[in-house]
Structure formats: C-alpha cells, structure tokens
C-alpha cells in the first residue's frame, strides 16, 4: 500500500513539474510567434516581387515530383510521375 502511494506521489510531482515547465516556456514561444506574424504582415504589405514568388513555387515543386493527377503519359501506367509537367 505504501509503495503505490509513493508511486502516485512521484507521478503527481512529475506532472506538477511538467506543468510548471510548460508554463515557463509558453510565453517565450508566444513571443516568437508574434514576431513571425509581424514579419509576415510586413512582407505582405510591402508586396513581394513576382520573381520571388516564382522561386518559391519552383522550389516547392521540385520537392514533390509526384503528379497527383497522373494522365498516363508514361510507359508504365499509374506510376505517379507525369512526363508532361
């Protein structure tokens, strides 16, 4: 009986320590999010150049070469890669 009480007390202590640690980290992370949000709105207000937008699109497209809507243009059907794009 005493062992289970000790285990319960240890678990409660760990939960309390975890909650204190998460409360101390939360304001720091919230501050980082507000900084990022301010940078995003400043970039949107300034207006991005079209070349920067195209570079972002190209960079994203190169990471995902799989075609979602495969048109069957390859020799192997349903391979997932589109030869025309």
From Swiss-Prot:
Main location: secreted
Span of the signal peptide: 1-22
Alphabetized UniProt keyword annotations: Antibiotic, Antimicrobial, Cleavage on pair of basic residues, Disulfide bond, Hormone, Secreted, Signal
A single GO BP: intracellular iron ion homeostasis
GO molecular function: hormone activity
Compartments in which it is found: Secreted
The protein's assembly and partners: Interacts with SLC40A1; this interaction promotes SLC40A1 rapid ubiquitination.
Residue numbers covered by the propeptide annotation in the UniProt entry: 23-54
Cystine crosslinks: 67-83, 70-73, 71-79, 74-82
Function: Liver-produced hormone that constitutes the main circulating regulator of iron absorption and distribution across tissues. Acts by promoting endocytosis and degradation of ferroportin/SLC40A1, leading to the retention of iron in iron-exporting cells and decreased flow of iron into plasma. Controls the major flows of iron into plasma: absorption of dietary iron in the intestine, recycling of iron by macrophages, which phagocytose old erythrocytes and other cells, and mobilization of stored iron from hepatocytes. Has strong antimicrobial activity against E.coli ML35P N.cinerea and weaker against S.epidermidis, S.aureus and group b streptococcus bacteria. Active against the fungus C.albicans. No activity against P.aeruginosa.
Name under which the protein is recorded: Hepcidin
Family: Belongs to the hepcidin family.
Organism (species): Canis lupus familiaris (Dog)
A GO CC term attached to the entry: extracellular space
Ranges annotated as spanning the membrane: none
Domain of life (superkingdom): Eukaryota
């Amino acid at each position: 009986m005493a062992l289970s009480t000790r285990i319960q007390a240890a678990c409660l202590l760990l939960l309390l320590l975890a909650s204190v640690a998460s409360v101390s980290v939360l304001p720091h992370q919230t501050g980082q999010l507000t900084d990022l949000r301010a940078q995003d709105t400043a970039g949107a207000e300034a207006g991005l150049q079209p070349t920067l937008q195209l570079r972002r699109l190209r960079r994203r497209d190169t990471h995902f070469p799989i075609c979602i809507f495969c048109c069957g243009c390859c020799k192997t059907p349903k391979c997932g890669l589109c030869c025309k794009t």
